[in-house]
Amino acid sequence: MNEVVAKGKKAKEIARELVLKSTNQKNEALAAIADQMIVETAYILEENKRDIEEGKAKGFSDSLLDRLMLNEQRIIDMAEGIKQLIELRDPVGECVSAWERPNGLSIQEMRVPLGVVGMIYEARPNVTVDAATICLKTGNAVILRGSSSAINSNKAIVSVIHRALKQTSLPPESVQLIEDTTRDSAKQLFTLNEYLDVLIPRGGKQLIDTVVREASVPVLETGAGNCHIFIDETADKQMAFNIIINAKTQRPSVCNAIETIVLHEKWAQQFGSELFSSLKERGVELRGDSKSLAIDSSIALASEEDWETEFLSLTLAVKVVSTTEEAIHHINTYGSMHSEAIITENEENVSKFFTSVDAAALYHNASTRFTDGSEFGFGAEIGISTQKLHVRGPMGLPALTSTKYVIRGNGQIRR
């Protein structure tokens, strides 16, 4: 029996145990993990340093190295995140709805764990902690499969989690890591229907598309973030500048950063040159259409591929349009249904944008950087779903549950 199958089988067994654990037992386990993370910070950083050094030797980009890098503050933040997770209401066992039928049957819809959750993800070691702890909070066993670039960090974090769980009533095997980072192990996970209840990919478009295309297990798609901001002709100049700069430069390597700005031509003719200069001063490389180049000839001409690309870096595409309808068409054509924004003082255009643009999160006069579980008040998230079934947008704790119906009677039979 190979590693993936063996760990899948074990996870299925563990899931039957976890469903019996109380909220207090789960929270005690989370507290132990948070404490152990702090105690073993030096060990985690030592292993993370190995990944960083190997990444530099392989020529990883600065944005990829940033996603891969851990430091003392990031580990403290992860531990604090776990403590905040403890304070969140446990959705398991919640009565979603209840009613009584004329025949006397009492029916309740109850929240239950999904069972075994698979996570396949790239680069970010913090996902190892997020996925493990959110799954434990919701009573799910989890199988983690990170990328080869973060294997040392992930192995260290999971070993720390195991040492913490040994001090609690939750089995250490509640969290398992697939240490084989070859393509074969990923493909096995895609088809682990006998043991896996859902597979959640987190990473770039290529990874997500591969999982969606090849997996036979149910998939919760956390789509890539090819996000846009549309500046219409009535947009306040300073507001538009502030939002665009924040959405692009605050942390360009994350999925809710923008990759394209769409400018109404009247606004662009008045303020475009100043905006472009402001972005370039902050290290942003601009790639625009012919109308953009007419405003600033130093901008590189955008290709078709640029409109489709999640850059995850300080590269930004620029599209100039004549109408709101043209902007919406461009966004719906190239967007990844993640987060899209409009900056405008025209309520009619807001309504049109909100009705017509197909995305998980739509913003009026605000940065797309707020698409995040903590910013939405969920307190924690397993990812941001861009699909429409089961859940959409930031996936908080209820997203890792299903429901079952509990029916109580006193001898009723169907006639």
Curated annotation (Swiss-Prot):
Reactions catalysed, semicolon-separated, are: L-glutamate 5-semialdehyde + phosphate + NADP(+) = L-glutamyl 5-phosphate + NADPH + H(+)
Per the record, the domain of life is Bacteria
Please list the GO biological process terms of this entry: L-proline biosynthetic process
- One GO CC annotation: cytoplasm
Write out the pathway annotation from the protein's UniProt entry.
Amino-acid biosynthesis; L-proline biosynthesis; L-glutamate 5-semialdehyde from L-glutamate: step 2/2
Keyword Oxidoreductase present in the record's keywords: the answer is: yes
This entry's Gene Ontology molecular function terms read:
glutamate-5-semialdehyde dehydrogenase activity; NADP binding
Q: Where in the cell is it found?
A: Cytoplasm
| InterPro entries (alphabetical) | Ald_DH/histidinol_DH, Ald_DH_C, Ald_DH_N, Aldehyde_DH_dom, G-glutamylP_reductase_CS, Glu-5-SA_DH, GPR_dom
Write down the top EC class of this protein.
oxidoreductase
Keyword Coiled coil (UniProt):
no
Q: What EC number(s) does its UniProt record assign?
A: 1.2.1.41
Keywords, alphabetical: Amino-acid biosynthesis, Cytoplasm, NADP, Oxidoreductase, Proline biosynthesis
Q: Record's family?
A: Belongs to the gamma-glutamyl phosphate reductase family.
Functionally, this protein is described as follows: Catalyzes the NADPH-dependent reduction of L-glutamate 5-phosphate into L-glutamate 5-semialdehyde and phosphate. The product spontaneously undergoes cyclization to form 1-pyrroline-5-carboxylate.
Q: What is this protein called?
A: Gamma-glutamyl phosphate reductase
